[in-house]
Amino acid sequence: MKDESVLNVLMYLFKNHMQENCTLDLGEKKLLVQLEELGFHRTVIDQALSWLNNLSYSAREPMQLPQKNSFRVFSDYECDLLDTECRRFLITLEQQAILNPHTRELVINQALELSCEGIDVSLLKWVTLMVLFNQSSEKEALASMELLVLDDTVGGIH
């Protein structure tokens, strides 16, 4: 039985389907059957696929970007869910040009959707990787993030 986690489903999909194919048909019955055969429960699979759908939709939505000389202030709600280490990690990714204001906001929004999983830096790394994967204009940032995430999970998910 797989660990009942939306993140585990997302990690499996990324490592076994998205990296190879660059696309993923979320409605494909074969995919649902495969995930269930691996031991994932249908409710967790549905949550993961819904999360991916939301990411795909959010990534296409126009977003008003902040001024170049502005800085991000986290709300009390965000601070409750994203500890200091998580916020520092996001700021570091932006300073290293892995994230820009648009992708940073996507990462925060998508991470907050997984708040029941318990948000930590490990989860943020995977969320960031999947957000960048869905941004066709962010190939260089994606490559940097892949190195950061996949190096941390040697022997992780098969």
Swiss-Prot record:
InterPro entries: Smg. Coiled coil: none annotated. Disulfide bonds: none annotated. Belongs to the Smg family. This is Protein Smg homolog. The lineage of its organism: Bacteria, Pseudomonadati, Pseudomonadota, Gammaproteobacteria, Legionellales. The gene is smg.
